[in-house]
Amino acid sequence: MASSNRGNARPLKSFLHELYLKHYPEVGDVVHLLNTIGVDCDLPPSHPLLTAQRGLFLARVLQAVQQHKLLEDTIVPKILKKLAYFLELLSYYSPKDEQRDIAEVLDHLKTNRDLGLDDRLWALIRKLRQDRHHASVNVLMPGSDYTAVSLQYYDGISIGMRKVIADVCRSGYASMPSMTATHNLSHQLLMASGPSEEPCAWRGFFNQVLLWTVALCKFRRCIYYNYIQGSIATISQLLHLEIKALCSWIISQDGMRLFQHSRPLLTLWESVAANQEVTDAITLPDCAEYIDLLKHTKHVLENCSAMQYK
């Protein structure tokens, strides 16, 4: 058949491989990659093979985001455990007056969990930072730009590390780092904060409390406003469009002729055509089924000669 889309496969695979670092991706990035499918081959954008490739890419992205959605109930409890752990370590390396302040926050965490915890954490961070660095920037926290605010409080890290933090923890609702990305950043930040001896140990654990405070604020906001559902809905709609286009071609005369020796696959597409619903978000089980269907369909299309599309 006509030349395939091997040239731009690597960016697609790289994006899919790195999806575990995003709680949900920026839809603009998904659309950009979607539009690169087929640019390096001589097939028209409406060709069924390219439609199948776009559909398969979207289905895989959607599957990853849906899986992250299922984990949302576990995120805040995990962050609270991290905060309790690092607050206790920070207290161990702190003087008596700071230990009292930290103990109050720990007591609040144990009795009230995350209710009102973010305000107490920011107050503690601000006090500890200013007690040790009297010339610290004195800026009130503006709304939800937690990442920008946190960058003025990190202690003893390089400009390069601050840039890494800013890149991973980008503010806004267009995308969101995953818990895996936050764990990776936590380890990187701990290594960048210096050796484990005092006073570097205090600095390292202070920076960890700050990072997980930012994570708590960002994830609580993300979950409360259900930002991930917007990503799921948009990607679902894009996938519906590709499936609808591919379905129309497969049940046409040309498609029927090409798939005449793949009757089980054709039957599945006829079922999709009969039950096509383009308004609802695609569920995780349906997404897995679409991936299997699109993979088999793509395989058939890749092994057809160009003449068979005529």
Curated annotation (Swiss-Prot):
UniProt keyword annotations, A-Z: Early protein, Transcription, Transcription regulation
GO biological-process terms attached to the record: release from viral latency
Pfam families given in the database record: Herpes_BBRF1
Domain of life (superkingdom): Viruses
Signal peptide from the UniProt entry: none
Role according to the record: Enhances the ability of BRLF1 to induce lytic infection by cooperating with it to transcriptionally activate the BZLF1 promoter.
Family as reported in the entry's similarity comment: Belongs to the lymphocryptovirus BBRF1 family.
Annotated protein name in UniProt: Transcriptional activator BRRF1
Originating species: Epstein-Barr virus (strain B95-8) (HHV-4)
